[in-house]
Amino acid sequence: MTRLRANLLLVATAIIWGTTFVVQQAWLGTLGPIAFTAARFLLGALVVLPLALRQLRSVSRTIRPLQWNDWLLLLVTGCVLFTAALLQQVGILHTQVTNAGFLTALYVPLVPLIGLILLQHQVHWSTWPAALASLGGTYLLSGADALILGTGDLWVIASALFWAIHVLLVAYLAVRTHAPLVVAAAQFLTCGLLGLLASLLFEGPTPADFASAFHGILYAGILSVGIGFTLQVVGQRFTHPADAAIILSSETLFAAMAGFLFLGERLLQQQLIGAGLILAGTLGVQLVPLLFPPSPSPLSLSEPPRAIRAASSASQNSCRK
């Protein structure tokens, strides 16, 4: 798959995620947010599982079977996904939606920053201005009010860190395992089961609650999780995680468009400017590297840093003994 096609898959993911905000607002019913998260990820896992099992058998025959450390990383990725979603939801309960939307977008510059410092990822120079454009656009689109940090905001900032880690883990595992559908199904199942346990402990949902959100669960489970998150994993196998973060941030833009089309919401001038900045960042990270190709680098996404390669090799050798 070409980098352009991979990026288009990520744009499709952002469109699906953006429209899901409208669905959650209209069809959440009386179901608690943690239970809703659990239901949609478990449904998403069921959607992807048959294809994932088929891909797992194929990869085991043609490339290599997944080792115990692969499964451990998949489990960690699911835990990170659940933690990010939970921290974000807790933060939203104690802050304004405007603050939450902007602070969540902090994961956009965090992805290339963490990748550069900890994983030695080399990024094209255009990534940094594109990330700042997306972050600034999100701020304007969310209202550009004075941002006074409270307890809820700190929870959302923590969730942004975990969203950034999740993007990096997905990028690494999609290449490492050669099985993006397995990566998707494993993280969905882990996140869904953790969410189910948390909802039983803290929310106590009833069958009537699940029934009230039936249509929302169907849409979010099949489209947002089953298709959207899976497209993310497939797309990230062929593009840089920093580029993926910027493209996925256009979710905010598509959420605003969906609100305009389906809920009659109107955008102010500053919000339109913000939407333009997000669009510019999304297009820039795709087009600028084509006009100004990067110089060859000894490190690539498909070749992790030396320390990770050495640890992985030693672990796999120990499994063969």
What are the residue ranges of the model-derived segments?
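Glycine-/small-residue-enriched transmembrane alpha-helix faces in small-molecule transporters
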Residues: 1-38, 79, 87, 145-175, ...
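Specific transmembrane alpha-helical segments of multi-pass solute transporters/efflux pumps
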Residues: 16, 20-21, 49-99, 103-104, ...
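Hydrophobic/aromatic residues within transmembrane alpha-helices
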Residues: 27, 36, 40, 91, ...
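Transmembrane alpha-helices of multi-pass small-molecule transport proteins
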Residues: 29-83, 110-114, 162-169, 184-202, ...
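Helix-helix packing/entry segments at the starts of transmembrane helices
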Residues: 37-39, 100-107, 170-192, 225-261
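C-terminal-most transmembrane helix of multi-pass membrane proteins
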Residues: 41, 49-57, 213-215, 249-321
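Hydrophobic transmembrane alpha-helices of multi-pass small-molecule transport proteins
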Residues: 48, 75, 123-143, 160-163, ...
